[in-house]
């Protein structure tokens, strides 16, 4: 069926016939079952594997479990049970998302991935752009009006700088061998944004280093129990990786109430 213009769903029968003819199917029958549909178009979707970027959270699994034991959970059973068991079965964090809107993955790579750069700040990106221009890869700096170190709202206007797609995708860096490096097209998991909230809200570490320890870790947070694998985890994971610390000291995790529908 490779190369045919047949619709994926319409190929089911042909695939079944082929497997039967090649004696590779034990039994073929129709079976009614639930199937994922696009929430926007209400059309059936097809899942297939993609290459992704991961954070190796498994390397800190035991430490995250230890730090979790220092948090005061209400109810305690959520911390030791639902959240604690989640940490015990922790897998690496799939960080990348194949979408358009969101925080771009700040990773640039050569075509053969022999060299990869992860950019950690606007200042670093500006320096890399200048290197690219000097090497003849880029013609000009699209952020030339942006002033590094100026944290004013005027300086951060979209007229001076916009780090979202499609603008950031036009930036082509240069490798140590002079080869062009293009940004990975994926975005960052939006839950990473949520977990980075304690730092992002005060623009840490680029601003407000003094006094940051007075408001972090948080004394108290509260959210629904459904955030066990969402906000609670991403706060805990990022704090563990960055500071070997908890992100919050006390937490109330409320239950959920649903009506009959």
Question: Language-model features: where?
Answer:
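Alpha-helical recognition segments enriched in aromatics with Gly/Pro capping
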Residues: 99-101, 109-111, 128-129, 136, ...
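Residue patterns forming the tRNA-binding/recognition surfaces of aminoacyl-tRNA synthetases
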Residues: 4-5, 9-149, 163, 231
């Amino acid at each position: 069926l490779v190369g045919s213009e047949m619709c994926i769903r319409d190929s089911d029968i042909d695939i079944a016939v082929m497997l039967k003819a090649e004696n590779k199917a034990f039994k073929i029958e129709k079976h009614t079952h639930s199937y994922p549909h696009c929430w926007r178009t209400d059309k059936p979707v097809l899942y297939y594997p993609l290459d992704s970027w991961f954070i190796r959270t498994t390397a800190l699994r035991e430490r995250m479990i230890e730090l979790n034991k220092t948090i005061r959970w209400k109810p305690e059973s959520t911390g030791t049970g639902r959240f604690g068991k989640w940490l015990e079965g922790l897998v690496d964090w799939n960080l990348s998302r194949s979408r358009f809107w969101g925080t771009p993955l700040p990773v640039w790579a050569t075509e053969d991935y022999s060299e990869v750069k992860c950019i950690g700040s606007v200042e670093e990106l500006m320096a890399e752009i200048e290197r690219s221009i000097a090497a003849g890869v880029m013609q000009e700096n699209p952020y030339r009006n942006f002033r590094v170190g100026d944290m004013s709202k005027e300086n951060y206007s979209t007229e001076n700088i916009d780090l979202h797609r499609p603008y950031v995708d036009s930036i082509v860096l240069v490798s140590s061998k002079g080869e062009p490096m293009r940004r990975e097209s994926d975005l960052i998991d939006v839950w990473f944004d949520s977990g980075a909230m304690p730092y992002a809200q005060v623009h840490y570490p680029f601003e407000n280093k003094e006094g940051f320890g007075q408001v972090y870790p948080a004394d108290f947070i509260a959210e629904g129990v459904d955030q066990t694998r969402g906000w609670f985890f991403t706060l805990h994971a990022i704090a563990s990786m960055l500071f070997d610390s908890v992100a919050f000291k006390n937490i109330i995790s409320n239950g959920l109430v649903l009506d009959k529908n």
